[in-house]
Amino acid sequence: EIGSMLVEDPDTDVVLLFLETIRDADSMRAMARRAHELGKPIIAYRLGRSRIGEKLAQSHTGALNANGASIDAFLADIGIMRVMQLEALIEASSLARRRPRTGGRRVAVMSTTGGGGGLVVDALAEGGLDIVAPDAALIDRLGRKGIAIGPSPLIDLTLAGTRADVYRVVLEEVLGSPHCDAVVAVVGSSAEYRADRAVRPILDVAPTSDKPLAVF
């Protein structure tokens, strides 16, 4: 009931759910359908993902907690986004509010660090997204600008790519490329103490594109 009220609230752009169990699947589905009609994303963090967590949720709520995989499948079916960490519930709300949902599952990942980029690629792939390598046209365009990248699913600019001018050009080209539906830019430790090398280019380029862009 509270969730449905928030969906109808004109001052609410995104609805966040902290779930222990789902007591009324029909009401949840109706709420999700109405939120979709109004263009309001719903994001959920669910307790009871492990077997012991399921038992704790049951004892705390007094309700039967369905199999975790079944709940996850139900949430996906009705269009409710799910996060795996509580902190991500807050972080994802900002992204969902500012950017429209992409129409596809193809995600390009660019990074200045192989380790950090690999971590993001793993998480996206586990979420069922397609991590796409740059196509020949993108590789050629960047090559003509003196920036060499390979056909790897992770566009790893390495330490050399922490130059602001290089990062800006690559981000602009990737956002403008039709080979992906969304982009994740990974700011690695190589730019941790020099925000101008990677963070500044992201802030400058992001407003110029309608393509969904997330930063890790």
PLM ranges: what are they?
Residues 1-216:
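Catalytic-core regions of core metabolic enzymes
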